Amino acid sequence: MMRPVVVKEKRVNESHIHAVEDEVRQAKTMDRDIVKHAMKQSVAKLNPKVMIKNPIMFVVEIGFVITFILSFFPSHSSSIPGWFNITVSLILLFTVLFANFAEALAEGRGKAQADSLKQSKKDVFANVVKENGEIVQVSATDLRKDDVVIVKQGEMIPSDGEVIKGLASVDESAITGESAPVIKEAGGDFCSVTGGTMVVSDEITIVITSNPGESFIDKMISLVEGAARQKTPNEIALNTVLTSLTLIFLIVVVTLPIFTNYLGFQIDTAVLVALLVCLIPTTIGGLLSAIGIAGMDRVTKFNVLAMSGKAVEAAGDINTIILDKTGTITFGNRMAHTLLPVGNETIEQVGKWAAISSVLDETPEGRSVIEYVQAKSISYNRELAEQGEFIPFKAETRMSGVDLQDGTKVRKGAVGSVIEWVRSQGGTIPKDVNQKADFISKEGGTPLVVAVDNRIYGLIYLKDTVKPGMRERFEQLRQMGIKTVMCTGDNPLTAATIAKEAGVDEFVAECKPEDKIAVIKAEQDKGKLVAMTGDGTNDAPALAQADVGLAMNSGTTAAKEAANMIDLDSNPTKIIEVVGIGKQLLMTRGALTTFSIANDIAKYFAIIPAMFTLAIPQMEALNIMKLTSPLSAILSALLFNAVIIPLLIPLAMKGIAYKPMSSNALLGRNLLIYGLGGVIVPFIGIKVIDMIVGLFI
């Protein structure tokens, strides 16, 4: 009997292994394709019309052109050998190519995601309901906003819309990657459906909410492709600073021959170009775009769609997070918290009958009762319940339970309903039932009475339980200097209990939608940036007001349009990860900028003595690296300047390691690692390269 099971498990495991191996092979193939495409694009981006968008690398490209021309038409007064000019020009060319490759590689990852999304946009037909009731089949591309469409089991939802009739299970794996279907129904906050998803059961009628080219998938494709990627304010500000530095150094280098002529010696044009390239911040200039694109890519990998890079950056500067209690801090499902016996009954008796009444109950509450009883090691006869007839919960009876084969009737449900049922069986009501029910209600819980025939045994205290690990996560946010505010419709007593248990900094009890806007504005008036999550139409104003609004994909169209981020997994706690990604983006940009500028110190000690030692022998004192020769020093500095860009591409793409800590601690850590490291690494790198170059010249 056991042999077939073992074989089946083996086959399942083998098929699972093969599937994983296929995925790994596909991933490697895709990575190779992305790299090949990036290499081609790095050459295509040499077009001056493209390069001028990056002023720093554009200057390097001009330097390449000048030195390349000098390789064939050298100056008559030049004392530099011909091979030096061509070597410098090649190094500058590869410097530009490496920078272009970094940007193209980041863009390629986004385009790969866009291609997979395009595959989900299949040619489908829609059953459109005309005003006269006639059903006409048309192509999804012909649908317009406000068209009414019927979608049956097994059919693809043709475009974005909202359910106006019916209820169905929808497979959203093409969008979210989550295989479990979700329930969509008319009315409420779960009526929004997305084009490209599949109805797997029942039938729904939807009204189309977008025109062709404006659907959710279309927006996703446009965003991840980065075709219309706008630079963020911080990126523009940093780019302006770097461009200004480049302009200053350009003026210095152009005017330098005037001073050298006065001192009685000349500097070759190729050496001046090399000096300029070593002075300007080419490292961060070559990686800046890649860092921004990769930051958006990391958010997308978390199944979060950011409407702009500005939203991701804002997440990194967040000071306050507004969180709903239900579904975010707590499970949102009432879970069994404790058992309260009445009269002379015992907890074991209450647990036994509560479990028997819940064995066949598939609701979250019913399952939580079984889990609680098992955790408390209370024994009960499961087979007895399984052999009985399950009585499902109904709005009319407000009870559920089981009728056992021996005629025993077990019920659990609302206090008033069960008391009335017990009385109808001829039973009496213990005096402390209502007292204990009131206690649970005042605590913010839900009381369920457990009864068998004409006898009440006790109550189940259902509580909206705080998710595991929330206290630790809020502590991490606190270390980052971020305040958490919990909004809940519960009374102040219950809200205070949940807030204390979860570890949030503040709470707003009996909170209405308009109260959330007031909380957000109050924080913003203090100069703070605020993030919040939401899924309902009533959350839309607050999502729009927040600096970072994360809407749930399962929510309404209004909520998604108001937010600047959408979580495809509909997990409200993901706002914490989004904040982390935003901080990682800002830290990566800041760290590499620090590293790039610190690099220049070592380059100064390499190239300045090489330029002036012959005319000013005292400058030899600055040659602290004891480089082989002036030409070797210049080439070594240029080679390091070029090679460091591809070496830092993985760091720019992945982002620097981020640990929750205060801003001051973070600044000190990064200055130590990337500031001091940015000084030490070039000294070592240039010296090693010089030793190698010295073997050939």
Curated annotation (Swiss-Prot):
Entry keyword Membrane: yes
Root EC class: translocase
EC number of the protein: 7.2.2.6
Record: residues binding Mg(2+): D535, D539
Catalytic activity: K(+)(out) + ATP + H2O = K(+)(in) + ADP + phosphate + H(+)
Main localization (coarse): membrane
Coiled coil: none
Swiss-Prot/TrEMBL keywords: ATP-binding, Cell membrane, Ion transport, Magnesium, Membrane, Metal-binding, Nucleotide-binding, Phosphoprotein, Potassium, Potassium transport, Translocase, Transmembrane, Transmembrane helix, Transport
Subunit note: The system is composed of three essential subunits: KdpA, KdpB and KdpC.
Protein role: Part of the high-affinity ATP-driven potassium transport (or Kdp) system, which catalyzes the hydrolysis of ATP coupled with the electrogenic transport of potassium into the cytoplasm. This subunit is responsible for energy coupling to the transport system and for the release of the potassium ions to the cytoplasm.
NCBIfam families with a match to the protein in the record: ATPase_P-type, kdpB
Protein name per UniProt: Potassium-transporting ATPase ATP-binding subunit
